[in-house]
Amino acid sequence: MTDAPVSRIRNFCIIAHIDHGKSTLADRLLQDTGTVANRDMQEQFLDNMELERERGITIKLQAARMNYTAADGEQYVLNLIDTPGHVDFSYEVSRSLLACEGALLVVDASQGVEAQTLANVYLALENDLEIIPVLNKIDLPGADPDRIKEEVEAIIGLDCSNAIYCSAKTGLGVPEILQAVVDRVPAPADAVEEPTKALIFDSYYDPYRGVIVYFRVMSGRISCKDKVLLMASKKTYELDEIGIMAPNERKVEELHAGEVGYLAASIKAVADARVGDTITLFNAPADEELPGYAEAKPMVFCGLFPTEADQYPDLREALHKLQLSDAALKFEPETSSAMGFGFRCGFLGLLHMEIVQERLEREYDLDLIVTAPSVIYNVNMVDGSEELVDNPATLPDPQKRESIEEPYVRMEIFAPNDYNGALMGLCQERRGEYIDMKYITKDRVTLIYELPLAEVVTDFFDQMKTRTQGYASMEYHLIGYRKNQLVRLDVLINGDRADPLTTIVHQDKAYNVGKALVDKLKELIPRQQFKIPLQASIGSRIIASTSISAIRKDVLAKCYGGDISRKKKLLKKQAKGKKRMKAMGKVDVPQEAFMAVLKLND
């Protein structure tokens, strides 16, 4: 391992939209610098989670240190800090950008700039990162790097005269990228003699050593014998070991300003070593922490219930374990008359929710029922107080509340302009407010809309992809709360309110949603031995209803001809039994029915 001076360290990350080849490029960089031997190489080397490889996305951040001999013959240390590309994980991106001085902007030479790339580029520009444009996949038959270069200049305003053409798949252009990182990314500030400050940009839970913290030393130095203080959580720890990721962990004695490494200190939970927190020395603490950290706030909520009641303790333990490695996941216990005991969980977005659900089922072997996602509403009460509601079933009664405010987002959609009409129609259906439309190039357009987050979290993304044959991409950010005429829509199954199906909808859409919901439930709930009424109600007013007819057993099969009174007696007995069954019977509602709220447009 080379102990490089600060002037020969380069910290950089890769910014790219999903599927533009970021993980493949990271693989090539590791291979070209000899960091990973060819025999150990596997695709998407930095994506450790099985789920990441399968979905082709990066969820958890990884980091890797590479030794590189540049054209001037000097040995440089390049620290690649991998970032997620999905909009849900923008908080993970923002903190990893803080640990870098430069970024490779990877754009697919056949597809061009996408919305999420743009969002991350703006984050990088805010952090004053040196951006190196890289046009990837130039070996594809549909690639047109010159046109895409103009597009990047037009949309982002970056000078692309020295953009690098490459193909991460074949390795073409990779040496030029490594040299460009050395030449164009500035070295970290030489602050070795200043008080020690290090930024935590990621952490994961190791069952044997506790939380492993990934950090970048901003100033000063940290050695493996130090006692450290985490400035935001005010906790102190004796270090067990520090080291570098090359890309597998390797112990070292000391790390100084500009270097990226990991530490283990028997930390119990990820929440104790929060991402964005500042590490300093206990004996010689820094005066102030590093700026710009905001705690991740959940945007989307849903209920998680085990299908078997006796799995509740297992679910609780699994959530606690997941929270050890995912500080953005929030949960609290919840009970429901229809579903029993479970948890109300908060997520960063729909993808985060899906991933958590999939990890619970896959890694902890649980069968889960997931209720439809909702957002946080701000309810202004008659007595002047305010209440935050993340579960539609707990919305206060109409007579107690004055108004309801819901979160709004500003959304930018990128698409070929053939799909303009389809996208505008979709945004209009979702109560969107048209703001602007810009032509980026002659055949690509950006639509800007403001719309309620609740309309986005259900299936907006799927619908957008369906209506544009997969060509559109979107990016959104929260812009605040607005008052709207919202009502709580309850669903009654056999006269009992089914909490998981309760939703908050706009007054004008209530009838249509209620009607669609009961019709969908009629398809999904299996017939029982008694008639099941399905109703949608606002308060005590039923606005839509239908019913599932009973399965009828032929009790007269044994009566051959003969006495009518015998038949009447049997039919009467059957009717009596059905009446009792209706009063006592519990309707078995399958998981698909609880997701019906999401599938109303199918």
Swiss-Prot record:
SMART domains: EFG_C (SM00838). It is found in: Cell inner membrane. InterPro entries: EF-4, EFG_III/V, EFG_V-like, EFTu-like_2, G_TR_CS, GUFP, LepA_C_sf, LepA_CTD. GTP binds at residues 19-24, 136-139. One of its GO terms (cellular component) is plasma membrane. Keywords: Cell inner membrane, Cell membrane, GTP-binding, Hydrolase, Membrane, Nucleotide-binding, Protein biosynthesis. Its main location: membrane. GO terms for molecular function: GTP binding; GTPase activity; ribosome binding. Its EC number is 3.6.5.n1. It comes from the Bacteria. Belongs to the TRAFAC class translation factor GTPase superfamily. Classic translation factor GTPase family. LepA subfamily. Required for accurate and efficient protein synthesis under certain stress conditions. May act as a fidelity factor of the translation reaction, by catalyzing a one-codon backward translocation of tRNAs on improperly translocated ribosomes. Back-translocation proceeds from a post-translocation (POST) complex to a pre-translocation (PRE) complex, thus giving elongation factor G a second chance to translocate the tRNAs correctly. Binds to ribosomes in a GTP-dependent manner. This is Elongation factor 4.
